[in-house]
């Protein structure tokens, strides 16, 4: 898995991500749908910044990722914040998700579901998350659509500065 190679650099490389805005949006959606507490899963949690924000907001979290190295970084952060007792980390492929119980909701951000592949795999991943969802549960996820490469990326120039 490619993410194993740079797990300890991921946060630095992803440094421009606005986790505060993402958290505010997700927390607002969870509250609006009656999921103000309980167990949530962060599917494709990576190094867990959002996972930890939700833990600190009072949720019991399950962080799921394929990369043991990403989970190791998350584990270190949770230990530093003193929230490890409210966090279960599972190294799993979300196509074969097994949470061993029900959840009130799930989140999956930063285009995790874009990496799943063709529609049958996507449908399977959604079905696995839904299988563990309590009645009335909420699943919040993001996807890139043709809009982004056509309108956002095409309208910008990207480059790298050399040494």
What annotation goes with each model-predicted range?
Residues 123-135:
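A short glycine-rich, Lys/Arg-flanked "PGG" loop and its adjoining helix->strand segment in the class I
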């Amino acid at each position: 898995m490619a993410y194993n190679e740079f797990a300890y650099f991921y946060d630095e490389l992803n440094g421009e991500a606005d986790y505060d805005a993402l958290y505010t949006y997700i927390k607002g959606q969870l509250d609006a749908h009656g999921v103000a507490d309980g167990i949530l899963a962060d599917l494709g949690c990576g190094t867990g910044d959002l996972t930890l924000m939700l833990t600190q907001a009072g949720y019991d979290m399950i962080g799921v990722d394929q990369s043991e190295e990403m989970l190791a970084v998350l584990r270190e952060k949770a230990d530093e914040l003193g929230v490890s007792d409210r966090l279960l980390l599972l190294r799993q492929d979300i196509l074969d998700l097994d949470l061993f119980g029900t959840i009130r909701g799930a989140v999956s951000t930063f285009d995790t579901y874009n990496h799943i592949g063709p529609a049958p795999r996507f449908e399977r991943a959604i079905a696995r998350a839904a299988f563990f969802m309590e009645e009335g549960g909420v699943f919040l996820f993001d996807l890139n659509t043709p809009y982004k490469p056509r309108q956002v990326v095409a309208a910008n120039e990207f480059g790298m500065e050399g040494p």
